[in-house]
Amino acid sequence: MNILRSVVSRGRKGLKQEKVNRSFAYLDMVYITSKVIAMSTPAAGIHKLYRNDELDVFKYLTTQLKDNWILLNLCAEETVYHLELFKPNVINYGFQDHNPPPLLFLWAIVMNMDALFQTQPLLTLVVHCKAGKGRTGTVICSYLVAFGGLTAKQSLELYTEKRMVRGHGLTISSQIRYVYYIEILKQFPNYLKAVEFNTGTTFFKSFKCLNIKKNSSLILSLHAFSKGRNINPVALWKSSDISSHNVSIKEGKRIWGIQCNLETSEKDLLLRVERKGQFYFPSSVQCWFHTHFQPMLVEYTNGINFQQGINSFLQGQQSISFSWSEMDNSRRSDPFFEQLTIVYENVF
């Protein structure tokens, strides 16, 4: 059983790297800081054959940390362990696997983490999703940026060092992007209220893809986070086949353009790009972005001080671009475009 768990958790560090009782050595959990633990999900039934046995997790927490622990469950999907076993020491902050949470929700999570530490100085927070990697890392890195004195880059490096035997801790571009959004919120906290109370809309005007592959058809769609129990993103708009789109050639590169004409009050949006064609297997890439914070992030990473220019991001026309490598799932197929540019206008 422990061999199977080791195979499933390969690449990630666990308590076997720590000096612990042998009975806990195969738990897939690790201390990122002395007060924050990253962990894959506890499990019952057949799932405990390859995940952390919920009874072993509970025994570790209660014997090593007494009652000074709280479990943060980030799984939006149905849990595979008995929540009742850990109550009242469990808080649910579920969001979809392989995705970031909405930005303001992410900020609320890290704010509550800090509040818990302020009221319970001996507390250890145990953060888990399914594998204890992507969603867990998004929240922990965001907390370290907001309250741990680290930059986004430093938090990502620390998480990789502490959590991984090989590879990177966070690999999904959208999750990494949202950690950087938190750094902007930390550096410029006055922006938070402006974004929270912004009731304006965003008018999406056009998309442009640079250097798309020949004989391929692109279909674009925009989605928003679901506000109900369904964890799947809600579709807002979808393009038609490439035959109705504008294709031009510039400097030997095919440029594909399309008008959008979508108005929405959503600020966190998912852009999905699907490729279809006679000579290609269907494939898709996507990215989450925030309509206010993405243009901020571009200027912030370029070293531009925009502290006095918040209104330019809350309203007015924006043009943002994502390279192929900045798209989620981009490593799973050969690039079918080089860069995608979105033009939209924020309106109060």
Swiss-Prot record:
One of its GO terms (biological process) is phosphatidylinositol phosphate biosynthetic process. Signal peptide: none annotated. One of its GO terms (cellular component) is cytosol. PROSITE patterns: PPASE_TENSIN, TYR_PHOSPHATASE_2. It is found in: Cytoplasmic vesicle. Residues 18-189 form the Phosphatase tensin-type domain. Acts as a phosphoinositide 3-phosphatase and regulates PtdIns(3,4,5)P3 levels. This is Phosphatidylinositol 3,4,5-trisphosphate 3-phosphatase ptn1. The lineage of its organism: Eukaryota, Fungi, Dikarya, Ascomycota, Taphrinomycotina.
